Amino acid sequence: RDLRMSRGLGDVYKRQAAERAGETAGYAETSRDFTFNASAAHDENSREVYVLVIGETARACNFGLYGYERNTTPLLDKMEGVVTFTDVLTQSNTTHKSVPMLLSAASAEDYDCLYRQKGIITAFKEAGFHTAFFSNQLPNHSFIDFLGMEADDWKFIKKDAPKGANISDDELLFLVEKELKAGHQKLFIVLHAYG
């Protein structure tokens, strides 16, 4: 009896996984008409540059910027305008769920809104910003890809690398430098680091 019940549950989970895969594949269609109705809050002539770094396996407790006893962030410590978030926890312990929640309004309680809504990159675009998304991860037809590819410029730097290559997150900085030199008055960049 227990074996039959576990097979039945397995079938339920497989069916749910197939349904989710279909819903995910249809993201472009189901979110097409979504809008934030966002607008800029600052003078259009003032330069604004925002960089959101999603550090995957990087741990705040190992950053000097967050009080770690070794100075592991000497350059960040000297920069003006750096904002650290000290009271933030992820709502999921898996990349495929936590990163989309960071890039959107979705939470663990209403994760399904991802199928109908766009992310923070689109909000910045609506507000008149040039947007960029650069990732040191491989694309995998997930919400991370979909939300990232809403940007004006996007690149997954591991995509063209030899299989199994270990690419340093520093490589993302060349893409940031290129965006900064392009002279966009309003710029929002998301870096999805390997950590």
List each model region and its residues.
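Helix-loop-helix transmembrane hairpins and adjacent membrane-interface loops
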Residues: R1-R7
